[in-house]
Amino acid sequence: MLIDVKPLYSEIKNLIMDRMSKLKKVPKLVAVTYKPDPSTISYLKSQEKAAKRFGLDYEIFEASNSIEVLEKLRKLSEDKSVNGIFVTHPLPELDEMLVFENLSPEKDIEGRHPYNLGMLMYGNEFFAPCTAEAVVKILENVTEITGKNVVIIGRSTTVGKPLATMLLRRDRSATVTVCHTKTRNLPEITRNADIIVAAAGKARLVTKEMVKSDSIVIDVGINVVDGKIVGDVKEDVSEIAKVTPVPGGVGRITTALLMEHVVKSAEKMNF
């Protein structure tokens, strides 16, 4: 069975639009990129369309060199007309920590800044990483998380690690196991899970044999195989478990939350 996230998306969007109606000015999101590849360009175009659907002002700044990236981030961080900054990754020739040193955590709508990740550890985050937050929103919409055995496949700072932290919070109290592609006996571990979150970036990694019946599988993966977008979960897993689709699942909610973060920043800035 596939999990339909459209009602959740509509609910989030309606709440955002209601909050936007109370603002004095239109919130603004600026995306900063450098030497973007075709997939990055495609993503930014889809992000621009999403911003327009939500009624946000949107700009793309393509830097001509790495120094210009840092200069632009500093300027945008100080610009009171800008509420959110999105930085495409990876940025050639630039250390990620150097990027964050020039980016205000209050405008880091992706929740990737070390300050925001640190606050997440204390359960006092302003921005959580959008994809991890999207997974939590979906899970809370379809099941009770407390006491469930959750296996996360993936250990990135954008999904795996922050998601584990969010699920361990006292108000959620899941039992969390974090695995990765080098984990021994991975099928043995996943078969005991009530919930599996596949975020390893490996196409069709999770198979039917790795999943127990009636479990919930959240597919975060986006991979291209023979020109087709596929997830980290093999398609037939939906025959025995509840699975989020790819595309149109986690990514849809992630986009909505990215826009919500821009509005949240605008509210804090008394826009």
Swiss-Prot record:
Reaction it catalyzes: (6R)-5,10-methylene-5,6,7,8-tetrahydrofolate + NADP(+) = (6R)-5,10-methenyltetrahydrofolate + NADPH; (6R)-5,10-methenyltetrahydrofolate + H2O = (6R)-10-formyltetrahydrofolate + H(+)
Similarity-based family: Belongs to the tetrahydrofolate dehydrogenase/cyclohydrolase family.
Protein name: Bifunctional protein FolD
Positions annotated to bind NADP(+): G154, R155, S156, T181, I222
Job of this protein: Catalyzes the oxidation of 5,10-methylenetetrahydrofolate to 5,10-methenyltetrahydrofolate and then the hydrolysis of 5,10-methenyltetrahydrofolate to 10-formyltetrahydrofolate.
Keyword terms of this UniProt record: Amino-acid biosynthesis, Histidine biosynthesis, Hydrolase, Methionine biosynthesis, Multifunctional enzyme, NADP, One-carbon metabolism, Oxidoreductase, Purine biosynthesis
Organism the protein comes from: Thermosipho africanus (strain TCF52B)
Source taxon at top rank: Bacteria
